[in-house]
């Protein structure tokens, strides 16, 4: 490991973005996090399609046809050209489990202004892509991303993966090292082998739990991303959309897909991939993404040869929303280095 490159950088800075004011109607509290009583869905909550036809994306969405396990499916993606002078390089942004390409809007704009072509897929099973009931694996997601880059005529790109997308990015870098010009693992999950920590849960049990998901459960699941335990106003739309899926007539199929993906995260660890990654790597994330994240993130950086670690203080799971100035500064510094 090169001593000059491999170092942990702890950044100081303010937490950007205002947090939500107290929502008395739903029982939320900004002072002490979310109230103990179950939260009630706001009056304006409505059904959302799990394939997000009713959610505007920041750039045109295209579709790549694929055949997977006998299913003819479509993989949605955005292919956004540079806004200024092109630098001839491309960046792929891989979303997390609770998200889809749309939430990368601000990141796309920053990268394209810096001269990058930006490719943003919705993995099959997410966003505007098809949602077949089939096996889901990280290797398949990496292969689908590889197929997309091949179709777009790209021989390599910088791969940026957030949350579950960090697991996909890890597997992509392992399987396609020649195509991984750089690797950014951004608040990735899967930092341990969960199979060694808890017994498996049957898929049907996970499915039944998801079928009965409430607004309170959706809110609290996303509130964990923020150190205050409160979802900011700017992020509330993701709570309403995810809850809105449960009101859709298509929720039973979408819930099964989510159950299968959750099983994938448990059954398909990436911890054994890190030592074999050859790409120049940045491990970056908010240091308040759970009590163990700084230690586990350092372990990742120590295991990937030559990796660099950047921890952003006071920030949780979504720094490009919570602390955009620092996050984008560090991302561009790494991509340009």
Segment roles from a protein language model:
Residues 5, 15-16, 22-89, 113-116, ...:
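Alpha/beta-hydrolase fold catalytic core
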Residues 67-71, 78-84, 113, 123-160, ...:
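Active-site loop/oxyanion-hole signature of alpha/beta-hydrolase fold enzymes
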Residues 73, 80-128:
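Conserved HGGG/HGGXW glycine-rich cap/lid loop of the alpha/beta-hydrolase fold
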Residues 174, 183-213:
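Flexible "cap/lid" loop of the alpha/beta hydrolase fold
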Residues 194-199, 212-275:
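Conserved alpha/beta-hydrolase catalytic His-Asp/Glu region
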Residues 277, 283-285:
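Short beta-strand/loop motif that positions the catalytic acidic residue
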Residues 288-292:
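Acidic catalytic loop of the alpha/beta-hydrolase fold
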Residues 306-337:
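Catalytic active-site module of serine/aspartate enzymes centered on a nucleophile-bearing elbow/loop
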